[in-house]
């Protein structure tokens, strides 16, 4: 499909730079294909679901993966920024470097040059490989938990570009850009639909008889990359590491067997569950990388509803929601949201999408 089919105009003032407080007071647009749009709030979610339904959350935890450093080469020193993307070993991370032209394979980078240091003093890495679009493989001098502590000391929360270009990261973001149930460290970006949940809302969901299940997909920096291709068939997704346990897979299959619905909180949860589900509609345990790219025409295997924020034009995430609820429906929903003052992107409002195709197990 042509990428320009997923374009739309978004006024800059619709981009949220801070979340609402309390978190669950964000607006929630209920989208049912063929039905009028309904304005609600996130705290209404328990009333929009049924006992026996199941919510699937991504429990990944954002790490301070934005690193500032100096590339050291004999007779030449240059400032370099690195956004860690995906861990591939105890001492190895794939990362996006800027400006990429200043770096070549074999270069050494010392991070924490701006007065910040880890408890060992410095955090150093070697550029082992360099690929396209500024992607590189960094091999750090530290490893394992020691490396994790060093990154936490010298790194910054990697706010999305549409926020970072408007204001610097601050201490509030360390709390705001993290879900209340985050447990598994490794994400470069937050699973932002989950930012709306509070402990009180989670308790109300349980009291309503709605199940809560957790999976892990470590969101990578590739989620911020623009689609440069003119056709969706020419776009390559970056892989992300995820895990679905046997217990969670069995529980979700049981939900469908008794007639309940699976509601994914965020596109990351959806992409992982769909990756773990066979053409027979059975969710299976999963551990590894997924680069699933969902566009209109995809037949959903497991997920019945999706709660998600409002996404960028021409993005892979807007393509995904268009596959889920229909391209025309989503263009209409976004036009409605823009006119009605909804706030967009990571710190913005949310939508609850019902699927255009209710034939659950077709693939």
From Swiss-Prot:
Cite the Pfam families for this sequence.
Answer: Queuosine_synth
Keyword set for this entry?
Answer: Cytoplasm, Queuosine biosynthesis, S-adenosyl-L-methionine, Transferase
Claim: Acetylation is one of the keywords in the record: no
| CC per GO annotation | cytoplasm
Cross-referenced Gene3D superfamilies, in alphabetical order?
QueA-like
Annotated compartments: Cytoplasm
**HAMAP family registered for this protein in UniProt:** QueA
Self-association and partners: Monomer.
The entry's protein name is S-adenosylmethionine:tRNA ribosyltransferase-isomerase
């Amino acid at each position: 499909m042509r990428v320009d089919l997923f374009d739309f105009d978004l006024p800059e003032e619709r981009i949220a730079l801070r979340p609402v407080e309390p978190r669950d007071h964000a607006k929630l647009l209920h989208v049912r294909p063929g039905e009028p749009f309904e304005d609600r709030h996130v705290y209404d979610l328990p009333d929009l679901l049924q006992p026996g339904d199941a919510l699937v959350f991504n429990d990944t935890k954002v790490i301070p993966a934005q690193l500032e450093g100096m590339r050291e080469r004999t007779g030449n020193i240059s400032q370099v920024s690195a956004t860690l993307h995906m861990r591939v070993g105890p001492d190895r991370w794939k990362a996006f470097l800027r400006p990429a032209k200043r770096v070549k394979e074999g270069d050494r980078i010392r991070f924490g040059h701006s007065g910040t240091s880890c408890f060992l003093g410095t955090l150093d890495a070697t550029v082992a490989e360099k690929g396209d679009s500024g992607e590189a493989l960094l091999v750090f001098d530290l490893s394992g938990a020691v490396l994790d502590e060093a990154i936490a000391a010298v790194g910054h929360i990697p706010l999305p570009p549409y926020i970072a270009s408007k204001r610097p990261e601050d201490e509030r973001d360390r709390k705001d850009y993290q879900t209340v149930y985050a447990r598994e460290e490794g994400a470069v970006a937050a699973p932002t639909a989950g930012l709306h949940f509070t402990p009180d809302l989670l308790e109300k969901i349980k009291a309503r008889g709605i199940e809560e299940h957790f999976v892990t997909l470590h969101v990578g920096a590739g989620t911020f990359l623009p689609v440069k291709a003119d056709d969706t068939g020419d776009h390559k997704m970056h892989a992300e590491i995820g895990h679905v346990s046997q217990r969670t897979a069995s529980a979700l299959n049981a939900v469908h067997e008794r007639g309940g619905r699976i509601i994914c909180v965020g596109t990351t949860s959806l992409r992982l569950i769909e990756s773990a589900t066979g053409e027979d509609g059975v969710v299976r345990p999963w551990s590894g990388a997924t680069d699933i790219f969902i566009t209109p025409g995809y037949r959903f295997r497991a997920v019945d509803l999706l709660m998600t924020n409002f996404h960028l034009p021409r993005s892979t995430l807007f393509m995904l929601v268009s596959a889920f609820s229909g391209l025309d429906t989503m263009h209409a929903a976004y036009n409605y949201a823009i006119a009605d003052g909804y706030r967009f992107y990571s710190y913005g409002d949310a939508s609850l999408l019902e699927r255009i195709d209710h034939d659950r197990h077709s693939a």
